[in-house]
């Protein structure tokens, strides 16, 4: 069954009362989305998820998925409860899980705590899972609404959705140029052509994404650290596309490889040459060439 088929099937099962109390649903889902974003950089490869528990129009619990391997958003919201959740409405950005993983199924916690209604932003993008939790909840007499701020909730999990549906990473390209189409002065002496806001955005992206990839020429010209400079930020894995293994051993990415992971993708098969980098803590990925460069299609599947 495809994801689209699963969505159609769930649409028939769900009691979609979006017109009634729509503004209230939107407001609480907006809060759940804001909570979910707090997990950026800490939950990969899991999705960002936020949850809000409401009883008699009052918020009694809030939570989000804070760290990979730890409690999911729904269980954190229940943990945060300041009143009995029995009869409450749960707003959650993503369909609750119904399988045993690093944590127990969230559907079990919802049922056990007597929650009366669950409002879901978007279904699980995994075609094998989409709609299953909805069905389980409905079978236990819980009202379910799906699709509140659906596009915003889908955008929250764009990285997770890409991987879970294709097995490939979500890639974001960062590119800066001047209004006349240049990326640097002809001498190469220019340091930045972007402003403070753009540079801050770069740091936020480094914190959010698992890896950052550059070509060897960037290393040769700039000797970048490729780290996250945000307070309490998380450093991404540094990936260097270096077909002929020209990255200098004195480069920052090599010298600090034991502190911040550095992966070098190369077509070089010389074991002794690769060992020099491995001694500094680098991980060498042997990737075939295509048109004289690293085959990115192959690299994306490693």
Task: Show where each model-derived region lies.
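Flexible, polar/acidic helix-loop-strand segments at domain edges
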Residues: 157-165
